[in-house]
Amino acid sequence: MLQDSVGEVTTKYHALSVPLSLECGVSLSGVRIAYERYGRADGKNVILVCHPLTGDAHAAGFHKGDTKPGWWDGIIGPGKALDTNRYCVIAANVLGGCKGSTGPSSEDPATGKPYGTTFPVITIRDMVHAEHQLLEDLGISELYAVIGGSMGGMQAMQWSVEFPSFVRRIICIASAGYTTPMHIAFGAVGRAAIMSDPEWNGGNYPAEKKPNHGLSLARMMAHITYLSDESMRTKFGRRLQKQDAFGYGFDTEFSVESYLQHQGETFVERFDPNSYLYITRAVDYYDLTKNGSLTEGLAATQAKFLIISVSSDWLYPPYLSQEIMLALTTNNREARYAEIVSPHGHDGFLLENAQLNYIVGQFLTPMTVEDLMTNNPPSIQETSSIREAAELMIGHEINHLPVVSGNGTLSGIVTSWDIAKSVAGDFQDLAEIMTKDVITIQRSDSLRLAASLMEKHAISALPVVDDSNHVLGMLTSETLSLSEVLQ
């Protein structure tokens, strides 16, 4: 049940305690990482949220005076998938970003001026190492999970390779195990738009005179890839914007043109052009394959995985997520796959909160037997007659009846089929027909375990017992969809 937001939050800034050794060979000192924290840490409950390409550390809650919550507020907070009553959630702005973490717009301590293009080229691996150092500095020695969508999913997968024993669960959404030629092509066009703007000036521009035109064009082009044909048909169609007929010129006329223009204009107010260059190049370099094999590249991973795709995503189509799944299962890793059904394209991972809350919530905090069992079910003493058992089952409209001993512990189970067979066998005593070697389960056990026990033993009910073998409840196949749980 979804509840409230995490409320008012503030972004914190941390200077890493050691220099970062980057993949390009540079050692970067004085790195600062912006982050937000929601919920209390207990040493084993920390979840790291990795943001997409142009995201930031403000993933949930509200900054003072704001009316718009963080970018993933729909799944972070009390009662949501990333339940802040249960987990401590940390979101950090990536290395190379422009929302508080060290990047090309930060001051170079050697010159007192912004780095610009003298900032070293970074990779997804470098981002993950910066996040790892942040967590170590904060006294966090392990992660319950890392979750991210798009470029955030790349970081999550990189975490599983770089620090396999540090993280227990990986949730990769609408992403891939490597960057495809199409992704590289889109990044190249975006960078060309920025670098061809005269105001870019080789990356040396004042804050008040950025290459906004080029950045706006880059955003417009990229935003097309976040949508889908269906979503654009539904949202815009061929509608004109504020006019009834064609103007026969080159001004903005169609609604979709106006929308993209708005996306570009608002984006330049919150993002740095050089950061866009650096981060898209980091995405270009992302490749978890080893010797051309994703299976080999993921061989050292240890975490449990949840891989999620979006049905209408053509930027990161489902087949890219399925490639990750194939590599993981080939390596005998515990992995689940889910597909969000959405018309929204790549943006579906930011919009389909109901599906995400269910899918992610079940992976992080699976339902247990206690959630579905019938509490305090009827039971019968083992000294009772078959007739008494039959009357009790008919009266309560049940097909499974626990049989208990004098001290209340479980000694057997009788079914409606046992009752029917007793007539043909002319049995009188319950002990003659009941099953004595009963397969049981405990209330804290997972539904997946319950389903597998039912399937393995070809049974349709499980008595739920405590440590003393007293019956607490019953779980039946009528309340547990075997096929859904196993899937």
Curated annotation (Swiss-Prot):
Give start and end of each CBS domain: 373-430, 434-487
Q: Which GO terms describe its biological process?
A: homoserine metabolic process; methionine biosynthetic process
What positions constitute the catalytic site? Answer: 150, 313, 346
Molecular-function GO term, any one: homoserine O-acetyltransferase activity
Q: Does the keyword Amino-acid biosynthesis apply?
A: yes
User: Which Gene Ontology cellular component annotation is one that this UniProt entry carries?
Assistant: cytoplasm
InterPro entries per UniProt: AB_hydrolase_1 (IPR000073), AB_hydrolase_fold (IPR029058), CBS_dom (IPR000644), CBS_dom_sf (IPR046342), HAT_MetX-like (IPR008220)
Recorded metabolic or biological pathway in which this protein acts: Amino-acid biosynthesis; L-methionine biosynthesis via de novo pathway; O-acetyl-L-homoserine from L-homoserine: step 1/1
Q: Which family does it belong to?
A: Belongs to the AB hydrolase superfamily. MetX family.
| Protein task | Transfers an acetyl group from acetyl-CoA to L-homoserine, forming acetyl-L-homoserine.
| Protein name, as recorded | Homoserine O-acetyltransferase
